[in-house]
């Protein structure tokens, strides 16, 4: 059972060894490499997005916590790293738009995969799919965290510890760098931030050969123990001995950030080798690349016979032609037509919106004119009523006065 509270999320060594990724057949070396790769993506993406270091640190902690509960085989490292950056930017009150995050990670993947830098069309179907996937993964992270995303970093303890120990100033930057590197490991889910801070201070002091008080032991003043500090130093030393982390495709539903087919070819070829061991001997490299291109959309590997059937149905090749001779070219043409149709649909929607807005404006103008005409006719009728009503009252008033005067004159005559 993983203990989760407002300010901690810690696992034992046994729980870490029995992670969901291990249960799905991913070995320890691959899991460590992919965790480091994802944290590198978060750090580089945050720098390109011009985010403060606190955002990258929070994103890396969320990344490590998420893969303690979910498997690397079910959630791709790239999309989880992007979602952690997006979520951490909001948690640290430096929000970025989803469009900006997708553009930055698209550029990073192009550079890491040695692909040409392409313009990311925000009206394409691929972009909308990436945006939906980014939001969906963010919801998964929040659900697995129980919406408890409080993170306490070791950085805030380092300055206090070093000031208390009266160490030289160059030790502070070294300890800060070690604290940043510790986030690429599982130390943040194994030890409290105070213990990690003591570990990086101890490692920095040993590197600069700065003596620390041992009688009484200095770590007891900071609520730490010697065995935990030694474990932190051991994990950091192991991290620096590893080669540069590379992406390993272990996720079944991994979606690249690039539109190019080269990154998909590498994934398709690896999947072909795993599923069809003898395919490389029976089919040449051109056929393998063509099959990977044809299966990129569906994410499945098909046989050459199925591809021949599909090409016959589409009518793009004759029965006597090779199976995959022009498959990549035809697929690119189909992709261009799909993009063009998407753009035409978007333009049509914009035109419809403009027409509807213009129609609403014309309706409003006509309503205003109609109201003005009604007001004018109403004022005219009111004026007429006033004129006619005034004269009639006046005539009635005068006639009644005349009548009274006549009656009174008659009475006077009678009295006389």
UniProtKB/Swiss-Prot annotation:
SUPFAM superfamilies (alphabetical): Cyclin-like
GO biological process terms, semicolon-separated: cell division; meiotic cell cycle; regulation of DNA-templated transcription; regulation of transcription by RNA polymerase II; response to salt stress
Keywords: Cell cycle, Cell division, Cyclin, Meiosis, Nucleus
GO CC annotation: nucleus; plasmodesma
Region (Disordered): 286-416
Phenotype of gene-disrupted mutants: Lethal, due to male sterility.
Any GO molecular function: cyclin-dependent protein serine/threonine kinase regulator activity
Biased composition (Basic and acidic residues): 304-315, 328-374, 384-393, 401-410
Main location: nucleus
Protein localization: Nucleus
Record-linked InterPro entries: Cyclin-like_dom (IPR013763), Cyclin-like_sf (IPR036915), Cyclin/Ssn8 (IPR043198), Cyclin_N (IPR006671)
Family: Belongs to the cyclin family. Cyclin L subfamily.
Function: Cognate cyclin for CDKG1. Required for synapsis and male meiosis, and for the proper splicing of specific resistance (R) genes. Involved in regulation of DNA methylation and transcriptional silencing.
Quaternary structure note: Forms a complex with CDKG1. Interacts with MOS4 and associates with the spliceosome.
Name used for this protein in its record: Cyclin-L1-1
